[in-house]
C-alpha cells in the first residue's frame, strides 16, 4: 500500500521537482551539482524549475537531465515520461538540396555574359581599326591631291613657257667679232676690273637659238665666256685670275634638304613664290634660297633631312604621328606648324 502511494506521488511530481528533492535528500546544493556536471548554476536552476531555455537544443537538455538523474541516483526510466513533456524532440530543419539545374542555369548566364563582353571588345577594336584606316586613307588622299596639284601647275607652266626663237640673223659689227692684231698692254691687264664682258661668238644668220624660260633667268656672270673664238691668233689671252671677279657670299637663309627615300614636298617663301613643288627621289639633294620665312609641306617627313641656317630641323613629332608635315621656318629657325 505504501509502495503504490509512493509511486503515485512520484508520478505526480515533475521531473524538475523529483531532481530537486533527490538533491536535497543528498544534501547537495545547486552550485555543487553545477560543478560536478560542468554546467552553469542557471542551467541547473532551469532544469529544476522545468524550464527549457530557448537557446539550448532539446537533445542537450535531455542529456543534462539524464546526467543529473544519475548524480542523484534516480532511474532514467522513471524520468522518460516527464522528459517527453519537458524536452520534446524537435524535428531538425532539413535544407532543400540544391538542384544541379541551378548550377547549369548560372553557368549559362555566365556564358552569355562572357559572350557579350567579348562582343563589346571586338566592336571597340573594330571601331579603332576603322578610325585608324580612315585617317591613314585621308592622309594618302591628301598627299595624292597635293601631288596632282603640283603636276597640274608644272604642266601649266610648261605650256606657258614654250620655247621662244631668238632672231640672231642681224649682222654683227665686224669690230665686235674680230680684234685687230694689236699688242695688248700688260699694264692694262694688271688692272682689276669689276666684270669682264666678252663679245658673243659669230653665229649663222639662218640659225635660231632656242632658250627656255628656266634658262633665261640664269646669271650671265656665272657662265664661262668662250674667248678663244673672238681672239685672233697672236693676241695675248686675258688673265681671268686677275680679273677681280669674286664669288658671291653664301645666303644665310639657304634651305638644304637631303632625301633618303622618295618624297613629295612643296616649299613657298615669304612672298608666296613656290621655290619647289613636286617629287624628289631617293638620295636626292635640294638647295633652295628665298625670302624667309619658308612654308613647307612634306608628304613623308621620315624620308627627308632638313638643314636651315646650318642647323638641322626637328621633324620627330610628324614622324611619330605618321602624318603630312606642315611647318614654317622663320628667321629664328623655330619650326612652327
UniProtKB/Swiss-Prot annotation:
A Gene Ontology molecular function term of the record: DNA binding
InterPro entries: Bact_Cytoskel_RodZ, Cro/C1-type_HTH, Lambda_DNA-bd_dom_sf, RodZ, RodZ-like_C
PROSITE patterns assigned: HTH_CROC1 (PS50943)
Protein name as annotated: Cytoskeleton protein RodZ
Residue span(s) of domain HTH cro/C1-type: 19-71
Record's comment describing the protein's domains: The helix-turn-helix (HTH) motif in the cytoplasmic domain of the N-terminus is involved in the formation of spirals to maintain the rigid rod shape. As this protein is anchored in the cytoplasmic membrane, the HTH motif may contribute to protein-protein interactions to form the RodZ helix, which is localized beneath the cytoplasmic membrane. The C-terminal domain may be critical for determination of the rod shape by probably interacting with enzymes required for synthesis of the peptidoglycan layer, including PBPs in the periplasm.
Cytoplasmic side: 1-111
PANTHER family (alphabetical): CYTOSKELETON PROTEIN RODZ, PTHR34475
Bilayer topology annotation: Single-pass type II membrane protein
UniProt key word Transmembrane helix: yes
Region (Disordered): 145-218
Pfam families: HTH_25 (PF13413), RodZ_C (PF13464)
Keyword Amino-acid biosynthesis annotated: no
Biased composition (Polar residues): 145-167, 208-218
Domain of life, per lineage: Bacteria
A Gene Ontology cellular-component term: plasma membrane
Membrane-crossing segments per the record: 112-132
Family: Belongs to the RodZ family.
Ranges per topology, Periplasmic: 133-337
Skewed-composition ranges (Low complexity): 168-207
Organism: Shigella sonnei (strain Ss046)
Listed SUPFAM superfamilies: lambda repressor-like DNA-binding domains (SSF47413)
Keywords of the record: Cell inner membrane, Cell membrane, Cell shape, DNA-binding, Membrane, Signal-anchor, Transmembrane, Transmembrane helix
DNA bind region: 30-49
CDD domains per UniProt: HTH_XRE
Amino acid at each position: 500500500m505504501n509502495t503504490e502511494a509512493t509511486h503515485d506521488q512520484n508520478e505526480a511530481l515533475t521531473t524538475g521537482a523529483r531532481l530537486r528533492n533527490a538533491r536535497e535528500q543528498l544534501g547537495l546544493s545547486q552550485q555543487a551539482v553545477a560543478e560536478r556536471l560542468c554546467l552553469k548554476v542557471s542551467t541547473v536552476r532551469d532544469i529544476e524549475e522545468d524550464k527549457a531555455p530557448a537557446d539550448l537544443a532539446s537533445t542537450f537538455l535531455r542529456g543534462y537531465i539524464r546526467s543529473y538523474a544519475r548524480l542523484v541516483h534516480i532511474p532514467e526510466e522513471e524520468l522518460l515520461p516527464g522528459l517527453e513533456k519537458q524536452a520534446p524532440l524537435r524535428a531538425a530543419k532539413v535544407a532543400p538540396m540544391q538542384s544541379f539545374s541551378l548550377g547549369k542555369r548560372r553557368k549559362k548566364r555566365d556564358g552569355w555574359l562572357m559572350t557579350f563582353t567579348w562582343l563589346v571588345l571586338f566592336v571597340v577594336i573594330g571601331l579603332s581599326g576603322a578610325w585608324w584606316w580612315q585617317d591613314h586613307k585621308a592622309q594618302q588622299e591628301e598627299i595624292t591631291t597635293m601631288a596632282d596639284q603640283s603636276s597640274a601647275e608644272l604642266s601649266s607652266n610648261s605650256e606657258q613657257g614654250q620655247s621662244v626663237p631668238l632672231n640672231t640673223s642681224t649682222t654683227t659689227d665686224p669690230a665686235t667679232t674680230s680684234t685687230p692684231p694689236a699688242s695688248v698692254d700688260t699694264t692694262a691687264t694688271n688692272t682689276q676690273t669689276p666684270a669682264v664682258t666678252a663679245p658673243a661668238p659669230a653665229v649663222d644668220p639662218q640659225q635660231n637659238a632656242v632658250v627656255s624660260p628656266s634658262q633665261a633667268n640664269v646669271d650671265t656672270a656665272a657662265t664661262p665666256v668662250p674667248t678663244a673664238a673672238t681672239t685672233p691668233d697672236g693676241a695675248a689671252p686675258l688673265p681671268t685670275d686677275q680679273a677681280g671677279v669674286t664669288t658671291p657670299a653664301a645666303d644665310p637663309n639657304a634651305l638644304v634638304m637631303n632625301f633618303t627615300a622618295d618624297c613629295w614636298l612643296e616649299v613657298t617663301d615669304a612672298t608666296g613664290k613656290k621655290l619647289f613643288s613636286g617629287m624628289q627621289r631617293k638620295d636626292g639633294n635640294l638647295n633652295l634660297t628665298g625670302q624667309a620665312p619658308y612654308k613647307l609641306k612634306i608628304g613623308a617627313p621620315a624620308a627627308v633631312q632638313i638643314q636651315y641656317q646650318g642647323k638641322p630641323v626637328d621633324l620627330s613629332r610628324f614622324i611619330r604621328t605618321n602624318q603630312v608635315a606642315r611647318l614654317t621656318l622663320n628667321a629664328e629657325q623655330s619650326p612652327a606648324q
